Amino acid sequence: MNLTELKRKNSVSIYRCILDGINSTIPIAKTIGLSQLTVCELANEMVAREILDITKPKRNVKGRRIHYFQPSHKFYTAIIDVQKNFICTIGITPSGNVTERFDYPVNYLDKTVQQILSDHVIKKLKNCQSFKYCTSVYVLCDSNDSYDVGEGITVTTKERLIVDAIAHKDKAMLFEFNGKCLVSLYSHVYQPKVSKDELIKAIPFDEFRCYDGDLFEIFIDSIQRIATKRLEDVI
């Protein structure tokens, strides 16, 4: 059975496996008759290639209509890759299914990512229509990229993001790996059905792990845990 057939016949179980984390693979593997290793490999491949593959914009993206997530969805996440000037948004249902994904360049935003980072991160993200329904926002950038903040003062991306988060008295988590900076701004955007406190409780960032190799592999673990970990208790 190839990956396409497996997804079609067992999409709920496989996506549940992906989003629940690696410990879920044993019972799911037994249920659908696969080994734990096979399920793990499929989960990694599906997440890396289908859910989080934001390395290239889609063809003919210029001028096409951007469809925003519908309020019926219960979880939304956005990933910003500063270096590639690209954004990926993902919609996830309460059952753990990844139902929608839209990729588009940052020129669809009100301002470029660079401008957002250098001018009050939280305020700009809140005001971006693209993030209207997102409960989770990640910013990927080079840790030592410099920005002129005026009066002859230059700060790195990491420093600026930390300062913005502290200044707005909001939650932010920052991780560094291989000269890259991953900042989670998960409570900075509007989502009407989940309160800030409930959302924070639902996101176990202490379980975050980084991987060597491809940059986007870091999301395999974080997204799968964030998406469904205790989510049913939150909604």
Where are these regions (language model features)?
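Extreme N-terminal segment that seeds HTH/winged-HTH DNA-binding domains in transcriptional regulators
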Residues: 1-29
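Residue-level marker for well-ordered alpha-helical positions
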Residues: 12, 40, 159-160
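Short connector loops/turns at beta-strand edges and beta->alpha or beta->beta junctions
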Residues: 17-20, 94-97, 144
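N-terminal helix-turn-helix
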Residues: 20-54, 64
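A short, glycine- and basic residue-enriched loop/turn
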Residues: 58-60
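Gly/Thr-rich phosphate-binding beta-strand-loop-beta motif of the actin/hexokinase/Hsp70
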Residues: 63-100, 171-188
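C-terminal regulatory/effector modules of DNA-binding transcriptional regulators
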Residues: 98-235
